[in-house]
Design a protein with these regions (language model features):
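Short, low-complexity, Lys/Arg-enriched N-terminal segments of secretory-pathway carbohydrate enzymes
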Residues: 1-54, 83-100
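Leloir-type glycosyltransferase catalytic cores
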Residues: 6-9, 224, 534-593
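Secretory-pathway glycan-assembly enzymes, especially type II membrane glycosyltransferases
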Residues: 46, 52-70, 77-110, 117-422, ...
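Donor nucleotide-activated moiety binding/catalytic core segment of transferases
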Residues: 47-50, 417-433, 437, 470-503
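A donor-sugar binding/catalytic signature common to diverse glycosyltransferases
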Residues: 183, 203, 491-538
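Catalytic cores of eukaryotic secretory-pathway lumenal/extracellular enzymes that build
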Residues: 204-206, 210-222, 470-476, 487-489, ...
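Catalytic donor nucleotide-activated moiety binding site of glycosyltransferases and closely related
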Residues: 401-415, 442-486
Length: 593
């Protein structure tokens, strides 16, 4: 929570006791000494005689009470020898097996000592009114990069008049995987001089969302934005609709093409099918186009698709705008980043005066990848004791049969080794420790994105104890406002995307997450050097936390701060790196001195 103190009733009691003593002393010293003296003398004499008469009885009573207390202590240690050991270790190694006095689960905590120091540091920082330096980008060079994948000075694609056939894409996964698939399909269509049909989204047993492209993105805007780069239509011509793609050899699955395939592989394997049949259907299409080597015009086209052509439909924009206004408590125009995501819904009714006069709430968006599937698949341990191990093992057996088969054939890896190698998802407790080490005060608003956190309230307590202002879209929007999104997980994920991308600070716990990658790329592209992202290294953090029994808070702060600052260094996109995550390259952005 950051703030500590005593209950009001305790304070009142202490004050009344102090006032009573002061009043008594004033009464004694301010009274008539002669009158008071006779009273005191008589009282002291009577008390002295009474003590002499009953001295033996008093001594015997105290001796008997001492003996009974000693006997009780001895009997307790005989019949419950483990009580002392258990109570002393519970703060550091709390288990989800334990319950509180009211029947609720205790906090599952792995770093009780560090959490205690973090709480004290937050109180001290609040008293000093210190503000974290990580509300801003660490390096000024971030501001010299600007979006330019849609620049108009580039020549129009010369091959638009030629059409080698149609490309139909059925993308799998959730919102973010489908977004990548769409932009990869745009690049492939351009590469093969083909016409792209508006992509379709497959129904997933995991996401259980029937949404199609037009339910999430603006179709006409998508086609208009890319009209000078690739031909796009909403449907196949009638003479191709009736074809059996599998029978004629036009059905292409993940088994037919490499993950992150090169342009050469598409020309060698896919182009002949396209010329022969006039159509190719990519079924279950996803991350099937590599980043290097790739012609610069195709790389730029992927950036243009992701950062400019894919705009959410008005229903999502309007609710996203409402969500942001309720977090920030403002209703005026904001940054280029907000405009791109919210469109015309960026403006709203003013509260009082101009935008500058409104008290704005700054917030951190935190994407916790601590869902049960992620936790179970990692094979790590998270301080939850026997119940946690049993639950996760049962989940693995039910949901990951291939993983279980592989484990039977491979050498087991210890939980300690998994953690030290950076293969364990960060817990809510670890996220809280990182934020407190970076100087964010306990009154910071944190928007929590993602699905259900494994362990529920007991797992979240170490985070909410330090940062009580934790909010979700379900907290900020009414059931009526959320009703149009019910049973549409991808559309709900779009609201999280908006809240994370437009946040003052975006904190990720898993750099491999598609949401984290796409959001951090969006913030780099449109942020103008004013949209910092916190990327902790799981391996480095595990090394720091391994010293949790001995490390000082000052040392912990310094090492975590260095880790985050180094990750914010302004770098060009490296060879083979994703333009969806790292768009700082000459194909996507322009550098102005």
């Amino acid at each position: 929570m950051g703030k500590q103190g005593f209950k009001q009733s305790d304070g009142d009691s202490a004050f009344e006791s102090f006032r009573y003593q002061f009043k008594y002393q004033k009464m004694v010293h301010g009274s008539d000494h002669k009158k008071l003296g006779s009273f005191k003398g008589g009282y002291v004499g009577k008390r002295h005689n009474w003590l002499q008469k009953h001295f033996s009885s008093i001594v015997f009573t105290f001796a008997l009470m001492g003996f009974l207390f000693l006997l009780d202590s001895i009997m307790g240690s005989i019949f419950e020898p483990s009580v002392v050991t258990q109570s002393s270790s519970r703060s550091e190694k709390n288990s989800s097996d334990t319950l509180g006095d009211d029947g609720s689960k205790n906090a599952v905590q792995m770093y009780g000592r560090l959490a205690s120091m973090a709480s004290s540091a937050l109180v001290e920082r609040e008293l000093k009114q210190d503000e974290s330096k990580f509300w801003k980008e660490s390096y000024r060079q971030a501001s010299v990069w600007s979006p330019c994948a849609d620049r108009k000075d580039l020549p129009r694609a010369e091959n638009l008049q030629r059409n080698n056939g149609y490309i139909l894409v059925s993308a799998n996964g959730g919102l973010n995987q489908q977004r990548v698939a769409v932009c990869n399909a745009v690049a492939v269509a351009s590469l093969l001089n083909a016409t792209l049909v508006i992509p379709r989204f497959l129904f997933s047993n995991v996401w259980k969302d029937p949404s199609q492209f037009g339910d999430i993105y603006q179709e006409d805007y998508f086609m208009q934005t890319l009209k000078d780069d690739v031909n796009i239509v909403k449907d196949l011509p009638p003479h191709l609709k009736s074809l059996d793609f599998k029978e004629i050899g036009s059905l292409v699955t993940d088994a037919d093409i490499s993950k992150e395939a090169t342009p050469a592989e598409y020309i060698e394997k896919i182009f002949p099918i396209l010329l022969k049949n006039g159509v190719v259907h990519f079924l279950g299409y996803g991350n099937r186009l590599g980043f290097d080597p790739l012609p610069s015009d195709l790389q730029r086209l992927r950036c243009k698709c992701n950062y400019h052509a894919l705009k959410f439909v008005p229903k999502i924009q309007e609710t996203g705008s409402l969500l942001i206004r309720r977090i920030r408590k403002y209703a005026g125009p904001r940054r280029k980043l907000d405009k791109q995501l919210l469109g015309n819904f960026i403006t709203g009714p003013q509260s009082n005066g101009s935008d500058m006069d409104i008290s704005q709430v700054n917030y951190i968006a935190l994407h916790l990848r601590f869902e049960v599937d992620m936790v179970a698949y990692s094979l790590c341990e998270f301080g939850g004791g026997h119940i946690e191990k049993t639950e996760l093992q049962a989940y693995r057996e039910d949901h990951f049969p291939l993983l279980m088969q592989r484990l039977k054939k491979s050498k087991p890896i210890s939980a300690e080794e998994l953690r030290s190698s950076g293969r364990c998802p960060l817990t809510p407790e670890e996220a809280a420790l990182v934020l407190s080490a970076l100087g964010f005060t306990s009154d910071t608003y944190i928007y929590l994105a993602g699905s259900q956190i494994y362990g529920g309230e007991s797992r979240m307590l170490p985070l909410t104890n330090l940062y009580p202002h934790l909010i979700t879209k379900e907290d900020l929007l009414t059931p009526y406002e959320l009703a149009p999104f019910k049973n549409f997980s991808s559309q709900l994920a779009a609201l999280d995307f908006i809240a994370c991308a437009t946040a003052d600070v975006f904190a990720i716990t898993d750099s491999g997450s598609q949401l984290s990658s796409l959001v951090s790329g969006f913030r780099t592209y449109y942020g103008g050097g004013r949209a910092p992202t916190l990327r902790p290294s799981k391996m480095r953090l595990a090394e720091i936390l391994s010293e949790n029994h001995t490390i000082s808070w000052k040392d912990f702060e310094a090492r975590v701060t260095n880790m985050i600052a180094e990750a914010q260094t302004v770098r060009l996109r490296g060879w083979g790196r994703s333009i969806y995550k790292q768009p700082r390259c000459h194909e996507c952005m322009c550098r102005f001195q």
